[in-house]
């Protein structure tokens, strides 16, 4: 009898220990799952950080996208110290040619891709929306134009500010070089492609801003996010160039910022995928908004 009682006691003790062990394992598993979920959510919010990721990423193209690219480059490299990102600002057309040829990973374009470019296997990845501001020197008394006035200025039909209610002063029409995405978008939106008569064609957004700001009678166009107090942004068709008006579809001159790839993003190498993961993360989206651009809808 005593032996039987001892056996029962041993079995009961073993059962209790096994139950406790299984309970402990269950608690540990739940905690691990919760931690994993929290970690995944945090990673999605902040963008993927991978200290083991190493190599290089190359971008080339639009000068209008310099402010955006530099901000993304800096924050991405902080999160991925093993990756070196290089960006060359060669113009949208050149950037698309480079990514098509495979000489860079990403081609930056401040205009939509053409059907021919897409036919070559280039994927249009829109990362932001930008407005094109029409600018004049600070001393110009004309602050509003219709889109028709703007067309006539750039096609040479109107050549003096007095014809628009301003002082007797020649209009100096400043534009970008032929390969510029800003120029391509501006001329396409105004329906004046290959019709413009420029006094000067400059090779960067900054050069246009500086030239217009220092030249009496000058008019030009630049990316909305680079506007400063050295120039006046004109009202077009009664609408100011603001983020709110662009989102509402009221402002005529807006265009996409594209980071083009040869093929779809999921076909790219791990570093390119990580770049787009970051751009599309909450942290990356905050960078886009911080530099004055609009998130694509």
What does each model-found stretch correspond to?
Residues 1-10:
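Bacterial Sec-dependent N-terminal signal peptides
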Residues 6, 15, 266:
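Short, glycine-/Ser/Thr-/acidic-enriched flexible segments
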Residues 10-18:
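Hydrophobic helical h-region of N-terminal Sec-dependent signal peptides
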Residues 19-24:
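C-terminal motif of bacterial Sec signal peptides marking the signal peptidase cleavage site
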Residues 26-93, 97-101, 105-297:
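Exported/periplasmic ABC-transporter solute-binding proteins
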């Amino acid at each position: 009898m005593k032996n039987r009682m001892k056996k029962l006691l041993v079995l009961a003790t073993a059962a209790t220990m096994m139950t406790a062990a299984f309970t402990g394992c269950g608690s540990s598993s739940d905690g691990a799952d919760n931690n994993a979920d929290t970690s995944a959510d945090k990673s999605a919010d902040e963008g993927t950080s991978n200290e083991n990721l190493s190599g290089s990423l190359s971008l080339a193209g639009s000068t209008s996208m310099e402010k955006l690219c530099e901000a993304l480059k800096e924050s991405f490299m902080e999160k991925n110290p093993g990756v070196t990102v290089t960006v060359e600002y060669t113009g949208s057309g050149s950037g698309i040619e480079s990514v098509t040829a495979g000489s860079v990973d990403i081609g930056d374009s401040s205009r939509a891709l053409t059907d021919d470019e897409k036919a070559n296997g280039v994927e249009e990845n829109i990362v932001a929306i930008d407005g094109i501001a029409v600018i004049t020197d600070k001393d110009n008394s004309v602050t509003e134009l219709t889109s028709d006035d703007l067309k006539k200025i750039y096609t040479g039909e109107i050549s003096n500010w007095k014809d628009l209610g301003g002082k007797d002063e020649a209009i100096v029409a400043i534009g970008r070089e032929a390969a510029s995405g800003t120029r391509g978008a501006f001329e396409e939106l105004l329906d004046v492609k290959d019709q413009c008569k420029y006094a000067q064609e400059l090779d960067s957004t900054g050069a246009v801003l500086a030239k217009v700001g220092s030249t009496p009678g000058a008019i030009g166009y630049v990316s909305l996010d680079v506007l400063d107090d050295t120039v006046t942004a004109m009202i077009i068709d009664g609408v100011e160039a603001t983020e709110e008006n662009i989102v509402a579809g009221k402002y005529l001159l807006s265009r996409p910022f594209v980071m083009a790839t040869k093929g779809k993003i999921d076909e790219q190498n791990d570093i390119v995928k990580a770049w787009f993961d970051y751009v599309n993360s909450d942290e990356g989206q905050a960078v886009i908004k911080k530099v004055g651009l609009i998130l694509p809808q």
